[in-house]
């Protein structure tokens, strides 16, 4: 009985030490030139004021789900960014704490979607997803966690709106 107890204790200690000392904390590499790295609240405000739709990824370098979803966000930016119409931004919550606090971001990753500078975009097809947070008006405000399907659905819907708006005379 004592041997099993000590083996379990040693395993738990190993997991604890591994999590503290061996977690990758290096900066998450950004592979897209279409993603704005926000370094100040003023920089984000300027982007929100100059662009119709903005998708913002609030992340932390130490967050494994943030690392997992980063290439997806970069690929979406490469495929759908449109100057003045649809922009993509990343905010490191450890470096720009004011911005994370301003938008009530407490979990990483969190993706907040803006239309004309305000959180919330009109997107269908996401009903019932626990990761999606909507406003009282039914607008998608944010996606909590690395929910690839929800993030892709929102971005592709916004991209379709941009293309549709450009096609109108």
Question: Where in this protein do the model-derived segments appear?
Answer:
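N-terminal targeting signals for export/organelle localization
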Residues: 1-33
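A short beta-strand-turn-helix
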Residues: 35-53, 97
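Beta-strand cores of modular interaction/reader domains in eukaryotic scaffold and signaling proteins
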Residues: 37, 54-57, 87-92, 110-114, ...
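Thiol-based oxidoreductase modules, predominantly thioredoxin-like and allied folds used
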Residues: 38-39, 58, 69-98
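Short active-site neighborhood of thiol/selenol oxidoreductases, capturing the structured segment around
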Residues: 49-63
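The canonical Cys-X-X-Cys-His
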Residues: 63-66, 111
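A short glycine-leucine-enriched loop at secondary-structure breakpoints
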Residues: 102-106
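Non-catalytic, surface beta->alpha helical segment in thiol-disulfide oxidoreductase systems
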Residues: 107, 112-169
